[in-house]
């Protein structure tokens, strides 16, 4: 599967014209530092960590801070920081092994009546959401909240480790849309201090519609090597789709790549003659989101590049060129920005 996978990566990177020029090295480092300190300070209190081990929490924060700074280069730093805290909560939930159903018996009624939720994750997130949503107008705020509900329900389904029944062709996409946070990503690009929702609903809703597919499927594509190599992480979108539809994994991978290219082209061509600021924000996200994946060690792209070179696979030179371009702008050692560690900040807060 390595050669078809490399072909898919090159197709995607070539079609989007990957060239990330959003930051100078110093700007990237300074933004990482700022967002790291704000995010870590939030999770000093035990109630915010929801029982997550401190070492694991440190890894979550560093992962999300990189994602935020790389993917949202046009976002004001205060918005970036509050969004970083929000996304860290989503990682905590995704990692949680606690069964959800017991604390969800009254969720809907409590939501309608404005009563406190019983699930500890919702208690913590509801404390933070007003701080995040104050940065957005009513349309984007509703979209972010609705996407949060979908994400929670998607994680609820995933607790059952259910890959989908064979012949249920729509199930893999249904689940992926629920837990992909694509609508949240699309809406979060447009804080009210930079964009007047009332003037840009058509453009914003179009970005949300296309970003849902693009963001989650880029993540699926760039995660595929890591997930395929990890025996504990075999169930991924590519294999789930192949399982449910009966197609080959190679066909599923090709279909995924087509989806990324189609939705990416739809965004760039649709916005080409629209407000230049919207186009700039969306393109900045797309370039940075890819840089984040290509440079983050957890996705093991460097290992993939080395394997393609050693095997002299077709496309290895092109993939190496893209990877080196990403590393040139995005390879920032966490020791330059991820300090002091959460453990130390917790002791200082005692």
Give short role names for the model-derived ranges.
Residues 1-350:
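Alpha-helical, largely C-terminal catalytic domains
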